[in-house]
């Protein structure tokens, strides 16, 4: 999860987030090289005597500054499109969970079970136990099996919301009347925190999301106790 004064991304917990982190580093390196080149040219202009001030045509230079940006954009677009299609793929999910956004809480329904559904509200600061996180803890966590593909169906009962868990590389809009889907796959067990990421009213800041990723055996025991 995030911590104060953090400069980088959260630790990747899913294959998609690992891909997004690598793409971020790839793009940032390209930006760094371009920025270095531009600063070098500016420093030359400021520290050396200008020459060729009367040049009216430079076909070679124009060719370079047309082709080079196109190549750079292709180097950015290709891995971006690859990740985009990976995020849309859902192959044989073992579980489907329907998520509904409300003002201002989330409700969850495990569609593979008959009566496994609940609402998830933020725990007020006054009710927190020692060690719990302010504005991030909920009364009912979403318990899911780790290392297995899970399909999340996301919508809203009222206004626009956005269901986001940064460490899993997830951010999907919850739109009234529309059903969006996302894939959740966690590489390790643990608690993973997120929040509503679309301004949805006065209590927008009080819609946390907590995923508890556990081994399959523990998930089966939990689901049996909830039914």
Swiss-Prot record:
It catalyses: 4 Fe(II)-[cytochrome c] + O2 + 8 H(+)(in) = 4 Fe(III)-[cytochrome c] + 2 H2O + 4 H(+)(out). Its EC number is 7.1.1.9. This is Cytochrome c oxidase subunit 2. The modification Phosphotyrosine is found at residue 218. Its main location: mitochondrion. InterPro entries: CcO_II (IPR045187), CcO_II-like_C (IPR002429), CcO_II_C (IPR034210), Copper_CuA (IPR001505), Cupredoxin (IPR008972), Cyt_c_oxidase_su2 (IPR014222), Cyt_c_oxidase_su2_TM_dom (IPR011759), Cyt_c_oxidase_su2_TM_sf (IPR036257). Its cofactor is Cu cation. Cu cation A1 binds at residues 161, 196, 200, 207. It is a multi-pass membrane protein. Residues 46-59 are mitochondrial matrix. NCBIfam families: CoxB. Mg(2+) binds at residue 198. Component of the cytochrome c oxidase (complex IV, CIV), a multisubunit enzyme composed of 14 subunits. The complex is composed of a catalytic core of 3 subunits MT-CO1, MT-CO2 and MT-CO3, encoded in the mitochondrial DNA, and 11 supernumerary subunits COX4I, COX5A, COX5B, COX6A, COX6B, COX6C, COX7A, COX7B, COX7C, COX8 and NDUFA4, which are encoded in the nuclear genome. Pfam families: COX2, COX2_TM. Component of the cytochrome c oxidase, the last enzyme in the mitochondrial electron transport chain which drives oxidative phosphorylation. The respiratory chain contains 3 multisubunit complexes succinate dehydrogenase (complex II, CII), ubiquinol-cytochrome c oxidoreductase (cytochrome b-c1 complex, complex III, CIII) and cytochrome c oxidase (complex IV, CIV), that cooperate to transfer electrons derived from NADH and succinate to molecular oxygen, creating an electrochemical gradient over the inner membrane that drives transmembrane transport and the ATP synthase. Residues 1-14, 88-227 are mitochondrial intermembrane. Binds a dinuclear copper A center per subunit. PANTHER family: CYTOCHROME C OXIDASE SUBUNIT 2 (PTHR22888:SF9), CYTOCHROME C OXIDASE, SUBUNIT II (PTHR22888). GO terms for biological process: ATP synthesis coupled electron transport. Belongs to the cytochrome c oxidase subunit 2 family. One of its GO terms (cellular component) is mitochondrial inner membrane. The keyword Magnesium applies. One of its GO terms (molecular function) is cytochrome-c oxidase activity. Cu cation A2 binds at residues 196, 198, 200, 204. It is found in: Mitochondrion inner membrane. Keywords: Copper, Electron transport, Magnesium, Membrane, Metal-binding, Mitochondrion, Mitochondrion inner membrane, Phosphoprotein, Respiratory chain, Translocase, Transmembrane, Transmembrane helix, Transport.
